Every structure is written in C-alpha cells, then in structure tokens.
C-alpha cells in the first residue's frame, strides 16, 4: 500500500515490479482523470489502455480479455471508482495476472478488497466474485482523489459506515480472533466518520479530509479482508442490489448503501422491536442531514417508483442467496417494502409482517 500526496509520480519502479506490459483498465472518465497522473510513472513501460464502458459486466469483461490478449499484458493497472476497480481486479484474477489499483475517488473501498461485483449491461447487480487475495498494490494519491467531486467522498462515507451496521450483525457471536478484530475496527471506523466527516467536507485536502479518505478507502477495505464473508454485507447492500434492478438514475453506490442501512435498522426495529436499532436510525438520520446523504427514496430521486418496481426491488433483495438472510430473523419482500418507505419514521413506529397496501406506499414518505 502506497499513500500520500503526489505518490503516483514516484511509483514507476513499483509498477515495474508487477510487469513490463501493463494494461490500464478503467472507465472513459476515470481514464481521462487518471492518465495525466500515470503518464510519468508508466513512461518506461509498454502500456495500453482499455475502457470497460459503463459497468463491470460479463460483456465488458469479454472485451477486456480481448484487449489484454492483444497487448500481451503481463499485469493490470486499475484506476477508477468501484466498478472500474472491480473490473480490473476480476480481469487480473481470471488471467492470473498481478493487479495494482489506483482509486480516483474515495467513493468505495473496492481498491483494497478481495471481491468484485458483476452487473448486467443495464447496471443491475447480478452476483459477486470472491477473489483469493487482495490486489498486489494499491496507490492512493491524495492529489488524484482530490480531483473527484465532493459527492463521491460523501458516498464513500455512506458505504464505509455500513461496515459497522452490517459486520456487527453478520459476525453473529463469533469467537474467531480476526472476526472479533474486524468488528471492532468497524466500530472504530464508524466513530471516526462520525467525528471527522463534517470537518473533512468543509476543508478538502486538509488533515481531516485525508483521515476520512483513508477511512473510506483503506480502513473499510481492511475490515472485509480480516473478517471475510462474515464481516461484509447484510441488508444494506441487499437493498442496494435490489434498487439497481429498478432504477438507473445516477445514484452512487454508497448513496444507495447509506439508505440501505436505514432500511436494515428499520427492519430490526419493526421485527424484533430492537430499541437500539431505533436509536441508531435516528442518530444516522441526523448524521445524513449534516452530510447530505439520502434518508429516503425521495432523496435519491426514486419517489416516482411504482409499487410494482418497489416489489421487484424488495424481491431481489430477498432472493434465496441474498445477504439479507444474514439478519438474525427472517424477512420477506413485504417487510422490506414497508421498511423502504418508512426510513424517516419516528422511532418506535409500528411495523410487522402484515402486507402493506398501495395507499400505504404512496403516503408513507
């Protein structure tokens, strides 16, 4: 792991350790943003670039394999956000090549995780692929990350803070040392974000900003690496996955995940009557208001979704292999729908297994 201000300019020898013919994989916009930073460190190598188009999809991966074959690539360098990093990691895994990731924003922890998500060509989540190891190298250059819109860091905070709310549930009562350590790291990560996020957003490039970038990109990634599948996703990411099947309105991954945390807490509150979940949800609502994270479907521009679309999203979130079933109680699509439309409800508002009507959906938010 290499991190710091301007570190990409000095990373040429590190990239050269991975190979002499790198294929640089990213999206059109991320390649445009990153290549000025990569030009100098890659000057002594025989480099080609390949764009993954819109999503890390099976069709995109086929094209990337062809590009790697044409170039006789011996390593992969992946600059970009979550989907670009996932594509680079998965391509490297499938071709058995080393990979270096270069995050262009702090929107996700994908640069340091042993996991890639695969989407349809229309952006709907299909499945994830657990990778046997983390990337060989991650280069986090604060100068490059600082070129990303503020919104990406806000989304990264939403994605990172989910680590606590999901890992504390998915880990159960595990006594394994690494899982215990990962859960405690997730709690510390949450506290850091509560304490420093507002100041970080007010002073881009400052000390707090760098600390929050480290938290969102690096610390969040370490938690999944230490804890494995038992410290990853639960309902918050399941809700994200469901929403990708009904809306492609430009909402960022971390924004949907942040909203999904509220849905998860609402499910805990409505089902077992978890008072702590109700308190946590109210705390997050205040935090989200401060940062500009979405608190409801309306905040994501999804208030016009039909009941059928909400049903589809909830059904996807509850499919048999969904991480939502890591909750310590069973849930069904009707309960998920009820939680999705009541994320801003007062603490202790009633809910349960009773199916909700169209009228309730329309008037809930």
Predicted regions and their residues:
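ATP/NTP phosphate-donor binding region
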Residues: 1-74, 297
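A glycine/threonine-rich phosphate-anchoring loop and its flanking beta-alpha core
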Residues: 93-185
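Short alpha-helical scaffolding segments that buttress acidic/His motifs in well-ordered protein cores
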Residues: 161-165, 209-223, 261, 288, ...
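Active-site segments that bind and position negatively charged phosphate/pyrophosphate groups
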Residues: 175-290
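C-terminal charged capping/lid subdomain of soluble metabolic enzymes
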Residues: 275-365
């Amino acid at each position: 792991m290499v991190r710091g201000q301007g570190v990409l300019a000095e990373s040429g020898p590190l990239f050269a350790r991975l190979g002499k013919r790198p294929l640089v994989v990213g999206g059109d916009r991320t390649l445009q943003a990153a290549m000025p930073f990569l030009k100098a460190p890659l000057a002594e190598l025989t480099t080609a670039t390949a764009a993954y188009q819109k999503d890390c999809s099976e069709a995109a991966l086929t094209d990337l394999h062809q590009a790697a074959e044409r170039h006789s690539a011996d390593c992969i360098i992946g600059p970009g956000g979550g989907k670009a990093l996932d594509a680079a990691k998965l391509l490297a895994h499938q071709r058995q090549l080393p990979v270096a990731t270069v995050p262009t924003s702090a929107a996700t922890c994908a640069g340091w995780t042993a996991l890639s998500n695969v989407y349809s060509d229309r952006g709907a989540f299909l499945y994830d692929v657990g990778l046997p190891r983390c990337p060989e190298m991650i280069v986090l250059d604060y100068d490059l990350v600082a070129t990303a819109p503020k919104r990406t860091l806000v989304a990264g905070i939403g994605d990172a803070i989910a680590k606590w709310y999901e890992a504390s549930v998915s880990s159960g009562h595990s006594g394994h040392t690494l899982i215990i350590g990962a859960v405690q790291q997730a709690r510390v990560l949450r506290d850091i974000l509560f304490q420093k996020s507002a100041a970080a957003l007010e002073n881009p490039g400052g000390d707090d900003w760098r600390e929050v970038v480290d938290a969102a990109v690096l610390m969040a990634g370490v938690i999944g690496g230490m804890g494995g599948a038992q410290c990853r996703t639960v309902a918050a990411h399941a809700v994200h996955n469901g929403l990708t099947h009904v809306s492609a309105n430009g909402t960022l991954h971390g924004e949907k995940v942040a909203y999904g945390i509220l849905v998860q807490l609402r499910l805990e509150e409505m089902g077992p009557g978890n008072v702590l979940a109700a308190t946590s949800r109210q705390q997050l609502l205040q935090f989200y208001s401060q940062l500009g994270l979405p608190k409801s479907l309306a905040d994501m521009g999804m208030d016009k979704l039909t009941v059928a679309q909400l049903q589809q999203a909830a059904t996807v979130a509850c499919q048999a292999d969904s991480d939502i079933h890591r909750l310590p109680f069973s849930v069904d699509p009707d309960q998920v729908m009820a939680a999705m439309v009541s994320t801003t409800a007062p603490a202790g508002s009633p809910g349960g297994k009773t199916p909700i009507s169209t009228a309730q959906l329309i008037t809930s938010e």
